Curated annotation (Swiss-Prot):
Translocase as UniProt keyword: no
Gene this protein is translated from: atpF
Organism annotation: Coffea arabica
Name of the featured protein: ATP synthase subunit b, chloroplastic
Biological role: F(1)F(0) ATP synthase produces ATP from ADP in the presence of a proton or sodium gradient. F-type ATPases consist of two structural domains, F(1) containing the extramembraneous catalytic core and F(0) containing the membrane proton channel, linked together by a central stalk and a peripheral stalk. During catalysis, ATP synthesis in the catalytic domain of F(1) is coupled via a rotary mechanism of the central stalk subunits to proton translocation.
Stated family: Belongs to the ATPase B chain family.
């Protein structure tokens, strides 16, 4: 087949009629001799080959290649659509997870914020209690110190008064009075 078409095509590249003498290469303006030579060459090289069969086979092959290409394209298109749907599904899933993480994150942040605020309030309350306890302790200590100081001063004042007022006669009278009290107590018990 290739030889026949190559031979036929090569005839179109031969020099024009004037160069070979009797052989005219212009197929459209040829005479009967040239046509018979061309037909002879075609018949000789194309034995057992039907031109319409060759053309039909060529067209069938071309049709099959086109159909195969279309089929492959449809398969690729179907695969691409399937992958696109899978990607869209994954995208929706990831978007939902992102929204859920965002919502959970916000609620977690709010929960942590509330926990922190509560913890700070508790700490402040404890500090306030410690402050009040410290103030009460210091007040009580100060009151005790003042009492002790007042008691010491009163005791010193009383001792000073006693020492200035005491003499031997007062001592003897106090001792006699105490002995009398003890004696009367002893009589009552007997």
């Amino acid at each position: 087949m290739k030889n026949v078409t190559d031979s036929f095509l090569s005839l179109g590249h031969w020099p024009f009629a004037g160069s070979f003498g009797f052989f005219n290469t212009d197929i459209l303006s040829t005479n009967l001799i040239n046509l018979s030579v061309v037909l002879g060459v075609l018949i000789f090289f194309g034995k057992g080959v039907c031109a319409s069969c060759l053309l039909s086979d060529l067209l069938d092959n071309r049709k099959q290649r086109i159909l195969n290409t279309i089929r492959n394209s449809e398969e690729l298109r179907g695969g691409a659509i399937e992958q696109l749907e899978k990607a869209r599904t994954r995208l929706r899933k990831v978007e939902m997870e992102a929204d859920q993480f965002r919502v959970n994150g916000y609620s977690e942040i709010e929960r942590e914020k509330l926990n922190l605020i509560n913890s700070i309030y508790k700490t402040l309350e404890q500090l306030e209690n410690y402050k009040n306890e410290t103030i009460q302790f210091e007040q009580q200590r100060t009151i005790n110190q003042v009492r002790q100081r007042v008691f010491q001063q009163a005791l010193q004042g009383a001792l000073g008064t006693l020492n200035s007022c005491l003499n031997n006669e007062l001592h003897l009278r106090t001792i006699s009075a105490n002995i009398g009290i003890l004696g009367s107590i002893k009589e009552k018990t007997d």
